[in-house]
Amino acid sequence: MKNKMLLMLSILFCFALADEFVDSKTTVGGYGELHYDMKGNDGDGKLDFHRFIVYFKHNFNSQWSLMSEVEIEHNMVGSESALGYKGGYVAMEQAYLNYWNGKWGFKGGVLLVPAGITNEYHEPPTFMSVERPEYNKYIIPTTWFDNGFAFYGTMSDFNWKVAFTGDLDGDAIGSGIRSARMKGVSSTTTSWTKTIQGSWTGMTGLKVGGSMTMNDAPTAAVAAVDAVPDSMNCGDDGMSECGNATDAVDAIAMGKVGVSLGEFNATYSAHNIYARMEYGMINYTDNPDGVESSSGYYVDLGYDIADLIGCGEDTNLYLWMRNSSYKKDDAGDAKDISLFGVTYKPMNNLSFKFEVGTAGDDDVMRMGLGYMF
């Protein structure tokens, strides 16, 4: 009885603390999405609650705030040996202090790399398709986040951002950078990942932008560089006095993989028309896999017919299509994607989606729902 009383008092105390610490300055949000994905060639369907995200924001005053986001993917988290199948994962995708004075700002902590449209704005109701564009998985991976800091601001209709985040993993770069994301785990700053982004919003409904991201991604061979002497006096007989200097020089050359990612994007949403496009290209130097570049694009076009069929003032019903193509290795074959879909939004923060089409050699059919708040 005494233990039950202590438990009840503890619960009441927690509610009292919640009233004390969670006030109007603290807000809670989030988003999530459920997918049904079937490839017509094999007839097997997959049902997956792909993402569940909780978002916390606290305003310390009118200029300083804390923003954070925690994600759970694929329902269950755990090792394959423990679950009997490959489980999902938990990640802290964002957690940063933010300063904004109306003209310019600063943020530091766990940040999203400001490259492309979808990496920064990937809540399910903000894009038409059930899944995020496949191009984004392999050319500009989403979600791409790391520890770092950024400065940003506005000048009339022009928005700018400069970000410095942790290195990519040079040993994991092959035909793409998706596997090279460190996600804030033991991040290094041998080169820093540097991103410059700009956008223009001077026309109603239109946003045009682009970015450049650069990093000399360190590899395991970086450790060998420390063993190279500051000077190599090999004497009259070549290598005899300094050992195998050639190996040392090779280690320096192999110590990094150069990555240069450029992208251009545009979005238009007005007068019942929806259009979005993005083109991205990655150039590599000293890539052990021999891949020199990766590139791709996608174009979405849609029209909101809700007014035509009397769906209601706050309702959207989009008929849309997507054309996309990407090459993880520009010396190889492209994967072409064509989709046709319907997206119903009973309100701006909810979406129900259906699409059919082709992805490479596969026929696909997908359904999904998503929310954000």
Regions found by a protein language model. Name each.
Residues 5-31, 36-45, 112, 117, ...:
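Outer-membrane beta-barrel biogenesis signature
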Residues 20-39, 43-170, 190-208, 303, ...:
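Outer membrane beta-barrel
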Residues 37-39, 130-135, 177-182, 218-220, ...:
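Extracytoplasmic loops and strand-loop junctions of Gram-negative outer membrane beta-barrel proteins
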Residues 39-43, 77-80, 115-120, 169-174, ...:
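Outer-membrane beta-barrel proteins
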Residues 151, 301, 362-373:
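Outer-membrane beta-barrel "beta-signal"
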Residues 200-329:
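Detector for outer-membrane/organellar transmembrane beta-barrel domains
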Residues 337-362:
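Internal helix-turn-beta structural module
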